[in-house]
Amino acid sequence: MKNVKRMIFSGAVVSVCAFSAIAAAAGMNRNKNDGELPASAKISKDTPVIVLDAGHGGIDGGCSSADGVPEKGINLSILLKLRDMLEISGYDVVVTRDTDTSIHDKGIEGIAQQKSSDMDNRLAIFNDNDNAVCISIHQNQFTQPQYHGAQMFYSATNPESESLARAMKSSFTKLLQPDNQREIKQCGKELFLCYFSKNPTVMVECGFLSNPEEAALLASDEYQAKVAFTIFSGISEFIASS
């Protein structure tokens, strides 16, 4: 298992200039509701480590769009953009994967066994830090194509996870999807990482690959950058208010 960790700008402050520059690079200069960018957070030795997970990977492609674009690549692309934004802003960031791979233990045979090992190793990374905020990036799918929009899932295992989910939902509504009425949703053991993570954790379903219009957006580099910035803003809002 490879635990990928990058640490920069220890003790730095997320300045308004840096925050605005990241927003501009993502093509999102202003909050659509009130004309203001979300609150930035001051980085200190007590600031949580940000742990990012790109769902699926390797032989596990996740769901796919109608034209065959797999979820795993979209998840990873958003994660890499988000990691850069966070690191530029001074956060310490850990990722479960930064390539198209499963992180199961070597020597494990069989798809089911590899998947189980992969999830165990992701959870170990989530729980490796006593002070962390964990985000698992995914895409949604449904049998009917009309459904669209991001949705946040959290577990009651950590009492702060609900607040993180609300901050993330608020960020998506303010910055990217003003008409999104999807409520945050509490999960059970079926969402393994969320349920068993000891840190505040949210699974961000960024959109529906079963919706052709949203799938086309999610496959585009420009929209992925906007999604990454929206998640970045949700994290910053949560930490600033904690």
Give the label of every model feature segment.
Residues 1-242:
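Catalytic-site microenvironment of enzymes
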